[in-house]
Swiss-Prot record:
Pfam families: ATP_bind_3, TilS_C. Keywords: ATP-binding, Cytoplasm, Ligase, Nucleotide-binding, tRNA processing. GO terms for biological process: tRNA modification. The lineage of its organism: Bacteria, Bacillati, Bacillota, Bacilli, Lactobacillales. The gene is tilS. It catalyses: cytidine(34) in tRNA(Ile2) + L-lysine + ATP = lysidine(34) in tRNA(Ile2) + AMP + diphosphate + H(+). GO terms for cellular component: cytoplasm. The N-terminal region contains the highly conserved SGGXDS motif, predicted to be a P-loop motif involved in ATP binding. This is tRNA(Ile)-lysidine synthase. Ligates lysine onto the cytidine present at position 34 of the AUA codon-specific tRNA(Ile) that contains the anticodon CAU, in an ATP-dependent manner. Cytidine is converted to lysidine, thus changing the amino acid specificity of the tRNA from methionine to isoleucine. Its main location: cytoplasm. It comes from the Bacteria. It is found in: Cytoplasm. The keyword Acyltransferase does not apply. InterPro entries: Lysidine-tRNA-synth_C (IPR012796), Rossmann-like_a/b/a_fold (IPR014729), TilS/TtcA_N (IPR011063), tRNA_Ile_lys_synt (IPR012094), tRNA_Ile_lys_synt_N (IPR012795).
Amino acid sequence: MREPDFLNHFLKKGYFKKHAKAVLALSGGLDSMFLFKVLSTYQKELEIELILAHVNHKQRIESDWEEKELRKLAAEAELPIYISNFSGEFSEARARNFRYDFFQEVMKKTGATALVTAHHADDQVETILMRLIRGTRLRYLSGIKEKQVVGEIEIIRPFLHFQKKDFPSIFHFEDTSNQENHYFRNRIRNSYLPELEKENPRFRDAILGIGNEILDYDLAIAELSNNINVEDLQQLFSYSESTQRVLLQTYLNRFPDLNLTKAQFAEVQQILKSKSQYRHPIKNGYELIKEYQQFQICKISPQADEEEDEFVLHYQNQVAYQGYLFSFGLPLEGESIQQIPVSRETSIHIRHRKTGDVLIQNGHRKKLRRLFIDLKIPMEKRNSALIIEQFGEIVSILGIATNNLSKKTKNDIMNTVLYIEKIDR
């Protein structure tokens, strides 16, 4: 394909109609270098001001030389370029988060409203297959979106309908680490896909077709349920369990950066069914608020965050909090380590007591206020006591009492341990 063909596609799709400034994520690979060439050549036709952004991951000897070459390229094209260096322990997830945080900083600094990436159809196939193998939710198998609004910016992926073989061979940098199978995506690209294509030579097309079909269903359900107020629990619970799940998943699409896991989604469902009033952080700066027959999910305001005085601990993580070291699923060594059976399926909330708190003991629900009175706990200790909560229920009041589930229930639900060590403040 020729460059004008790509321009015509961009114009037909109207990718940049709403944008005057766009930031291009420039890695130096063939796909991003060709996208740079098309966008820089046709800035006038597309009516955009182009800004370049590059992250030097510092993982290869060639990285610094490539950075210098990209600076030269930007200077020759008379385009601004912003560069940041990755630091810390490297992983695919950390590098991705670092890149997108940096790109958003560049956009704020320059006033750009669009972030353009060079993801193409081959990336889409790899992404869908990765998510399928990991067992992600069905709606995420639609893959990467062509256009995606996140807050006040729009991410545009104009190459998503093209394969890498559609791009002409132009000057670019080859990342030799892509040939290694250390990372999951590389194993998908180098090993799994070639084997699957032996069984079905059109396997890539089949995967893309499934992704598009799931996207169609997702959009259709959103349109058909547009007049249903999912936040009205009386209305939501009037439908079958299956329909409730689908409606709730569609509702969660309103929050693209929330990304609940299956276990977290199940936890939200359980809270909506079992709690009359509830207010807790759930993930990525969002909180779930339930008041009788109504609920909502919204961003936590700084004031609300301070009032909650709460920490959320995820599986395989540790945190020092209020004089204790909490380790979720990672054993601690020592003679004074407290161990509490918990589930690895969802996060743990560590907080202070709230009005209406209840602990289940011997199958009976007991208000914390009454428990503290019965145990003659001093007021100062009541106010400083740390509550450990999971699945919306109190698991333990640290150093005071625990939820003594039956042995069978413990075996069924509790499949890991929260380790707690007293430390100097």
